[in-house]
């Protein structure tokens, strides 16, 4: 078998191949034959000059083949490798990565003898390849490649029995298998990066064009273009070198760690750790000068607990409490996603730890006992590094579309070149060299030299704008996706609502409908549960943890001490000592503690009302009605319960089975919390709704609470229906929040129902939909998803994508990881202050001259506006003694510094640092607000329209150039060297200025066209080209009437004449008009007048045309090789140019009105996908 499907997030497919011997390669032997034929047959039979042309063509073709082996991995495999069916015959493999994970690569296949633990079993052969710092192993049993396995899916019982690597043989085997715990990335050099850039297809093509222009005597233009190319490529290489050097500085901490090997504790460097090692990890005591200790690898906490700062991975500064697996069911398998509160992730810092000396294996330094799970690039930090590392390549917008569009233009260029070739060969006196040169120039004119640079700038400008707003992106290709988003999904808690919870009181203990706020009237047992059933912890003498739990403690007026003891601030109540915690788990929807009050042991439990209900001995009569009443009001409700435990030892309490602790409970009331909606949630979501986006809420909260909040933030506006099970049966029905409207559930009527109602479903309903294969029929029409588990959030996003929705998911980056990764655009919000106020933002967009670049602060600081713009023109006191010239020099130095730093180069993406990015999501926003969603969508739309206008302008310039270089070239019309240089500079300046247009502050209801291939763009191109062609043809024909009847030789050197002059002037005006007409300003970007540099460049271009056409400065026209125009011809040119502009402008505006961008018709795709699924089920 020559091909293997790998699946997964990194590699999709692997093809086996074998390298051919040098003489049998397709880039060697065919050309050896061709060169021999040229030497023995062609040279003797034709003129030497024609033979040299043939040799030049053959050499160019050979060089092109060699270059294609660098550009295309598929072509390289075809030329230099042969396919093999057996893995034993292969020595390399072609790796096809998963979509959006980079480009294909050919990597060597390694065969080696694998060491085994037992000498008697002999050595086994291991076959593997390394791809992007990951190893893939071939399994002969399965006949497939899979990722190198790490011990991450064993049972808790297995980990608790771990004693590390017991022998030197096992250590050697593990070292050979997994390697050292390092981030090994070779240091690149400037020369290597520059060589890579110079081997890019666009760059080679541009250098080839420069060579052709030199042969056609365009020396100034060629040298200018070549200088510009090398300047930009060297800037790019320098910027990438800095980025990669910064990434290489990230190292696994080389601190020493106590490791249990061969039956004893030994001190080893963190870089020597291996998966399976048992280690002692903790923060050194302050007496020994200990600092925050960095965790060197991903490890599972066996014994002891730790408080960890995970900001380097999640960007979230709130410390996380890590607990041991002691007390968990021994047969339960580890899932790092689900059991992350037991896992210490590499790169994070231990703030404090609590050892447990009751375990059989004692740590020598008082640390926590842990077992290493993953090392090196397989750790969470390593994965994030890989994401950042392999997204530092050059980024472009719509690369496949740009290729197809250029191919479309090449067709026209080839037709024009063919016309010139046929006509030229009819004249036997024509120089074949000049003829072939002319044809080559026509075909190469399709792609201007600045195109790749401008496409990169389109994305990178957006990246920089987002970074200045505190939004970091690790996957730049997703920015254009943001412009295509039509569905925005939001988590509720901590995203739409504030983290500052308000404790409203306790309900459900009396017949009173309002929650009891007087804590003296609340049973002491209920207060004890609220005071102790939590996961709060002291870090550096400060209480940290869930804001809801802190609000409850404050609301009941109890205190909590560092020794895990809770006691009332007033009165003589008993203290509550926590003995064992069972932390909150999203799949269980509850948490519990075992406490001791005086000499009595009790279990305190809190969780979702419907979850606790199933575990109560007696359910109060008004239980359901009470919690539903509070949730309808938008409150968050937690059910409280307890049970008495028999007398026991402390060790027995800690070993109790969680399920036994959390069963047969006695109800103790409902804790009711108000969850205030963030001030800007409703305005931001209303703006999104008004800008043609559908809104969806996905939350783990209760359905009634979710629907109440959804109504306040404009997600639902129609009457709401909630899908639920009817009574104890298995039938489902739609019920309104007040239970006055009830409609039987039928999956076939969902679409009709969704037209008049907003639908809400819960996690249990999703399980039903999965069981009945109705997911695709129902989920696309739902507005609110409540009580959903993290895995269900992922399923919801996958379903929306399957029916053709452009999805954005906004969450907090902890419970929403799967959904954030699945969405086209995932935005993780971190709780930091906003970097800019709305007023600052609007000022920023109004005036570029008054705005200075925002400095990037460390992750812990707020990003503030700074620089010249904030001083409002006043000279700082320390600079008042400087002269005007010195001040000017300082300003110039500051500008140069800005250009030279790592963010001043719009050509390269800004470096995303660890701590800025979240491993949860492609976009990380350091805001306690959903406002970044609008910023990301604005930048996405801006990138889309900028790319679209670039291609339109490119298309029109290409079609006009193809005509000028073909039909007019045959008539002897040419451009001078200076003329071509000025034209090139003008085009580059225009492209640069349009790519830096900033998006408008307000999102428009109008949508950008998602693709280059649309009716609007095609009609716009054809219509404008027809007008341009008419203007060009009539102008040249008019000029010919004033020309003396002289024969102009097409191959003759350039000399000024009237037709050449008119041709240049018309080309200049067409260029200015093309940029002015096709600039996409409102409603997405700044208008032409607001984009000052572009506006002034247009005025300068139009003014330049008027000046040279009016012949105001004769010396200027002489230097440009332009002859004087007759008065009548001059007036006609100016009138025709004005008419051409008005007609093109009107045509463009008419098409924008007639063919606006629209949301894709996802319902058609939903029906098609559902019908296809039905067919598969029948088969």
UniProtKB/Swiss-Prot annotation:
Listed result of changing residue 699 to I: In pdr2-1; increased inhibition of primary root growth in low inorganic phosphate conditions
Membrane topology, record value: Multi-pass membrane protein
PROSITE patterns: ATPASE_E1_E2 (PS00154)
The protein's enzyme class: translocase
Subcellular location: Endoplasmic reticulum membrane
Main location: endoplasmic reticulum
Lumenal-facing ranges: 43-50, 216-218, 423-435, 968-979, 1035-1059, 1111-1128
Signal peptide annotation: none
A GO CC term assigned to this protein in UniProt: endoplasmic reticulum
Keyword tags: ATP-binding, Endoplasmic reticulum, Magnesium, Manganese, Membrane, Metal-binding, Nucleotide-binding, Translocase, Transmembrane, Transmembrane helix, Transport
CDD domains linked: P-type_ATPase_cation (cd07543)
Biological processes per GO annotation: cellular response to phosphate starvation; meristem maintenance; pollen germination; pollen maturation; stem cell fate determination
Region (Disordered): 833-880
InterPro entries per UniProt: 2TM_P5A-ATPase, ATPase_P-typ_cyto_dom_N, ATPase_P-typ_P_site, ATPase_P-typ_TM_dom_sf, ATPase_P-typ_transduc_dom_A_sf, HAD-like_sf, HAD_sf, P-type_TPase_V
Residues exposed to the Cytoplasmic side: 1-20, 72-192, 239-402, 454-947, 998-1013, 1080-1092, 1149-1179
Source taxon at top rank: Eukaryota
GO MF, any single term: ATP binding
EC id: 7.2.2.-
TM region(s), chain numbering: 21-42, 51-71, 193-215, 219-238, 403-422, 436-453, 948-967, 980-997, 1014-1034, 1060-1079, 1093-1110, 1129-1148
Disruption phenotype: Imbalances in cation homeostasis and severe reduction in fertility. Increased inhibition of primary root growth in low inorganic phosphate conditions.
Binding site for Mg(2+): 812, 816
Family per record: Belongs to the cation transport ATPase (P-type) (TC 3.A.3) family. Type V subfamily.
The protein's role, per its UniProt record: Mediates manganese transport into the endoplasmic reticulum. The ATPase activity is required for cellular manganese homeostasis. Plays an important role in pollen and root development through its impact on protein secretion and transport processes. Functions together with LPR1 and LPR2 in a common pathway that adjusts root meristem activity to phosphate availability. Under phosphate limitation, restricts SHR movement in root meristem and is required for maintaining SCR expression in the root meristem stem-cell niche as well as for proximal meristem activity.
Protein name listed in UniProt: Probable manganese-transporting ATPase PDR2
Species this protein is from: Arabidopsis thaliana (Mouse-ear cress)
Gene (UniProt): PDR2
